[in-house]
Amino acid sequence: MPMSLGNAFIKNFLGKAPDWYKVAIISFLIINPIVFFFVDPFVAGWLLVVEFIFTLAMALKCYPLQPGGLLAIEAIAIGMTSPEQVKHELVANIEVLLLLVFMVAGIYFMKQLLLFIFTKILLGIRSKAILSLAFCFAAAFLSAFLDALTVIAVVISVAVGFYSIYHKVASGKGVSSDHDHTQDDHLAELTRDDLENYRAFLRSLLMHAGVGTALGGVTTMVGEPQNLIIADQASWLFGEFLIRMAPVTLPVFVCGLLTCFAVEKLKVFGYGAELPDNVRHILVEFDKEERKARTNQDVAKLWIQGLIAVWLIVGLALHLAAVGLIGLSVIILATAFTGVIEEHSLGKAFEEALPFTALLAVFFSIVAVIIDQELFKPVIDAVLAVEDKGTQLAMFYVANGLLSMVSDNVFVGTVYINEVKTALVEGIITRDQFDLLAVAINTGTNLPSVATPNGQAAFLFLLTSALAPLIRLSYGKMVIMALPYTIVLALVGLFGIVFLLEPMTTWFYDAGWIAHHVGEATHAVSGGH
């Protein structure tokens, strides 16, 4: 019997998502305007934030762009925020958007070099704990100079490469033949167990790398977008930023690496999976075949990609241009010198990041609601009202950490630094206290936010990437795997803020490493940013 038109509409709405999920989204869309108009806009705002987090948490059931987008469109339509405010948010975050559009595509054209390097690392280090440390440390080191999203894009690209090599061979095909690695139909039972273990192995490496980006990203002014904003407001340069953060970031970095080693050794929280022998064998064979089949043309490509990698690191570390523009230069150089000149070959590079870029635009419209409905105002006012300076530092760190878990850490950091700047200009706090608070804000937004994927853009990118469903990495799984790190990073960071920050900063002043700033810093950034 053919389906009625009404049923067809219902069936088409959100496609293959479960029925309960469709009902949930429709009920959100019905409830929100009622709460906004008849109860309280403030409550409606928080309700929207919770609903959006729900769509992120269910990313494996349905990509969050559609349900989150519907919620955002309705929020704008009923007046929770305006299209102008959304545009303002997008303009303020144009660097992040450019980065996603161009840099991630640029990394796609560096794939051969990345696979070459990481295959050597993966096969060269036998101990899983040492390998995890290597991934975590490498991600941290790179994130101190590059953007965390760029680093995660590199790691994702490598992991997809490793996954597809094994999946192809396990499905009974040759290494070089075409293959769809999203389908598990052709796998024998024996290889399914290996595949599950391999997925767990890749999951743990990706999470170590993800946390590594947070460990490294907090230390320097170029590590995360909000660091740049905070450094700009405080008039700190690269060296001063590094030194001022050190009392908190160094202990956190050491404890983060110790946590990485511990969870692997103890095999807890979903860590500890080893690389199955069959998979290692396939990867070794793949490496041998690649070496044999490598022509001079391939070697030339690797050299070119190596040179471009040097340009990438130098360009980003010295901030020679906006990150996205450096990404665009990578696309142009890599394609021109490796002979990729057809339009359809270029198109594939953009497939990975554009859905996420669209999702991020929706995310910024939710941020616009947070600004227009002043959802964070009660928290900010309460913290600024605390009299005792030491307590105020700790409170700032905690409040920042909690808000960063729900919202984008760029947004939270920006809102806080603006409020503190206003307090400085109005003479409520001294310049030295402002500098200490800036450290508390930076570490508060960067460290505890590893708790959930919405806190760290790099985690959100990983969760919504094409790789996440392949290795069965869900929102819940990420939260659980991040838990030991969340606890250690948040507590050690708090310890640093409470016990180390003031005495160490005084010592830095006395040693002449940093100088006292006089008067207020740059004027507060306009609007929400």
From Swiss-Prot:
Q: What is this protein called?
A: Na(+)/H(+) antiporter NhaB
> Keyword annotations for this protein?
Antiport, Cell inner membrane, Cell membrane, Ion transport, Membrane, Sodium, Sodium transport, Transmembrane, Transmembrane helix, Transport
Q: Member of which family?
A: Belongs to the NhaB Na(+)/H(+) (TC 2.A.34) antiporter family.
List the Gene Ontology MF annotations in alphabetical order: sodium:proton antiporter activity
Entries under PANTHER family matching the protein: NA(+)_H(+) ANTIPORTER NHAB, TRANSPORTER ARSB-RELATED
Q: Which Pfam families match?
A: NhaB (PF06450)
What topology does it adopt in the membrane? Multi-pass membrane protein
Chemical reaction(s) catalysed? 2 Na(+)(in) + 3 H(+)(out) = 2 Na(+)(out) + 3 H(+)(in)
State the species of origin: Vibrio vulnificus (strain YJ016)
